Amino acid sequence: MYYLGLDVGSSSVKAALVEAKSGKSILSVHEPKNEMSISSLKNDWAEQDPNVWWKYTCTAIKRVCKESNIDPKKIISIGISYQMHGLVIVDKNGEPLRDSIIWCDSRAVNIGNDAYEKLGEDKCMSHLLNSPGNFTASKLKWVKENEPEVYEKIYKYMLPGDFIA
């Protein structure tokens, strides 16, 4: 029996197989061979297509199973780590409505800083453990204010790892 680990990063998706009983690493691969592209339409913006993550996740899983000669039916659990604070918004069919605004995008920092001022330092530190300057919620509010036609169609919003799961 085996564990499958996935790491959905902004440069690649990694897949690793570990033997469940011994903890021995069997094989680790990453897709694509070169880095995934990041779209930057303006300064301080950074976006990626969630469907590209999905494509490379599927490719990496198939590769790690094939190259290790492990039957996928012997995988007993899957763990996912991923880039934080990325905003993925989908419609009722689970299709992304726009590219994901990822962790290194700074367009919504002022929105987060305004929230910090309104909420106050005590509340932010006790509930958020940080200033919400670049948090996903700030990015969601940016979409609401700047792309209302997209915001109206949102069925669910999530982080990159949730989209993959």
Where are the language model's segments positioned?
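N-terminal glycine/serine-rich phosphate-binding loop of ATP-dependent small-molecule kinases
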Residues: 1-98, 110, 126, 153
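Hinge/lid segment of periplasmic solute-binding proteins
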Residues: 109-120
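Short, flexible helix/strand-to-coil boundary loops that buttress conserved ligand/catalytic motifs
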Residues: 91, 116, 147
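Residue-level signal for well-ordered alpha-helical scaffold segments within enzymatic catalytic domains
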Residues: 59, 63, 114, 142-145
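Carbohydrate-associated surface elements
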Residues: 105
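Gly/Ser/Thr-rich active-site cleft segment
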Residues: 2, 8-10, 123-165
